[in-house]
Amino acid sequence: MIKNFDPYRDRQARLIRNSLSTAFVQSLKDRNPAAFAATAELLLRQDISADKKAYILDRLARYRECITTIEQQGVQTILEQSFVLWDAQLFFEVHEILEGLWLTAQGREKAALQGLIRAAGVYILLAAGNRQGAEKMAAKSVQALEENGAALAYFPSSRQLLTSLRNLVPSPPKLRG
């Protein structure tokens, strides 16, 4: 997390995070970085603090890296894309991209997706210094993934993720290798 960038207490930071994330999800759908690049350019033109500029530039770099990985490795599904984002530690964006799948999923798949969304939330909370909230969310995530993870068409390194969540390992595991 960029020092002094707090989307929980700073409305402008929240707007920046949400705008960039929405544009990035659109770029993933379009398979074109234009949406997030244009959004970042507009945000960088505003009168914003150095920490907000650093956040935007950091996100731009990670978004470009993810788009490149997705293109070069032929990653097709949203679920597979979410693990590329996970490995880039884009946990808010993992939540955003999986939420669309979760809304249309049913049964065990829906529960498993909720478990993954909560797993991303664990690392968002840890980065914000909310260990107590992360512990509660990790327990819910572990239960959902243990009971329903097999319903996902693609779930690399599930054991590693479950171990990290159970032990609340502060450094998130790489899930794609």
What are these regions (language model features)?
Residues 1-93, 100-104, 147-177:
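N-terminal alpha-helical interaction modules that lie
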Residues 74-75, 107, 111-114:
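Residues that mark the junctions of alpha-helical repeat units in TPR/alpha-solenoid scaffolds
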Residues 98-99, 118-119:
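Hydrophobic, membrane-inserted alpha-helices
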Residues 123-126, 136:
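Extended alpha-helical scaffolding segments
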Residues 130-149:
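TPR/TPR-like (Sel1-like) alpha-helical repeat modules
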